[in-house]
């Protein structure tokens, strides 16, 4: 599928990101998985060489995927293909744009390349998605040009608790702004370490200026539906599908649950007979230094 023409205009990039609302974006490591994801109803796939669970288990430095691998997935499906670049690694982003990916994830799942600076996303035609654990972090990424935000969660664990915490935090901070007087927003902007203009926008609109999706630890249809009920615009699923016992059926079930997140009968029906979910890791058992969501600022 050919890449979108965005002309580096923030509004156009955000408009392109709107197409993913209400949908599921799935991590895939080869063309076969990409085709499974497309057949299951995924709105996009994330091409990477190792899913987060394997990155976590194998350790070492994790970088952008091989261009040949990304090309194979681009050729295999007709839905948009995303790919990850390291935080701050603008040359990896340049390469991904050259390859024709439709979205770049400046991702904490990969080993950060720069501990002081994120990528200047306005310098690219391709839109970016970035992770956030709170509203200030989300607005700083938007100020750098991100066209989509995802609450981080804790990737590769199968434990949805951090995804819940981050989504609730962002939503609560948004709600707090909506009740503030205009003069209080100056103080809020300082506290959030975010531009005043973006803080005012959130206060007036009651939402981010870009779509807010969720990620990290989503492993079941019920997980996906819960995150949608908590206010997510869509769902990223990483290890939860292809580290499970029946990836094809689980992928379809998570898509159905995301689309019908307020329908317990549908969620119950699609949750039957899925086989074993990924084994997972309790986030509380992870040392702070091993928590991927801590990356970024």
From Swiss-Prot:
Xref: CDD domains: pdxS (cd04727)
Enzyme class: lyase
GO molecular function terms noted in the UniProt entry: pyridoxal 5'-phosphate synthase (glutamine hydrolysing) activity
The keyword RNA-binding is assigned to this record: no
GO process terms (BP): amino acid metabolic process; pyridoxal phosphate biosynthetic process; pyridoxine biosynthetic process
NCBIfam families: PRK04180.1 (NF003215), pyridoxal 5'-phosphate synthase lyase subunit PdxS (TIGR00343)
Function: Catalyzes the formation of pyridoxal 5'-phosphate from ribose 5-phosphate (RBP), glyceraldehyde 3-phosphate (G3P) and ammonia. The ammonia is provided by the PdxT subunit. Can also use ribulose 5-phosphate and dihydroxyacetone phosphate as substrates, resulting from enzyme-catalyzed isomerization of RBP and G3P, respectively.
Listed name of the protein: Pyridoxal 5'-phosphate synthase subunit PdxS
Source species of the chain: Corynebacterium efficiens (strain DSM 44549 / YS-314 / AJ 12310 / JCM 11189 / NBRC 100395)
Gene name as annotated: pdxS
